[in-house]
């Protein structure tokens, strides 16, 4: 254990693991924001399409995800680099997965994309379990939408956030 703990490679791998774990936690607030948007959709068909569109990455196998992102993050013809080239008006060639300084960013993008739908679904279930009477009472008391969100929605979503945090770290 002494040799292992003194090894710079071991320390670097632990640091990289922590960075990737923390970066993957960005999917929790993103999933919550998307769930708030999905919760506001009243058309059942549109809501189903919305949920399916965001949950699809959880259904797709890992090999398919790798192939999709290999195409999206390519250096010369990747979708992200092409979009950046069109926006900036010059050829952009960023090695999202080949440049050692950017591999954590590329891996984090993939991780966030694959967990975003699951986080959205858990948050959506939590949002739909909040009694509407609480919002109605707060409206009668004169609370605006931000105060209702801050004092009703966020506190009642706490257990969902804790669950997503723990499963996200694992």
PLM region descriptions:
Residues 1-170:
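A structural signal for multi-pass alpha-helical bundles of membrane permease subunits
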């Amino acid at each position: 254990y002494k040799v292992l703990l003194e090894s710079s490679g071991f320390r670097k791998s632990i640091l990289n693991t922590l960075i990737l774990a923390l970066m993957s936690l960005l999917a929790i607030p993103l999933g919550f924001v998307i769930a708030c948007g999905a919760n506001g959709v009243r058309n059942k068909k549109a809501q189903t399409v919305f949920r399916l569109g965001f949950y699809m990455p959880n259904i797709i196998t890992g090999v398919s995800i790798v192939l999709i992102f290999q195409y999206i993050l390519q250096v010369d013809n990747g979708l992200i680099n092409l979009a950046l080239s069109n926006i900036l008006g010059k050829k952009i060639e960023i090695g999202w997965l080949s440049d050692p300084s950017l591999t954590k960013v590329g891996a984090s993008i993939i991780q966030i994309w694959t967990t975003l739908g699951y986080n959205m679904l858990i948050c959506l279930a939590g949002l739909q379990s909040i009694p509407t009477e609480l919002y109605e009472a707060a409206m009668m008391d004169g609370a605006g939408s931000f105060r209702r969100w801050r004092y009703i929605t966020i506190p009642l979503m706490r257990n969902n956030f804790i669950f997503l945090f723990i499963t996200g770290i694992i």
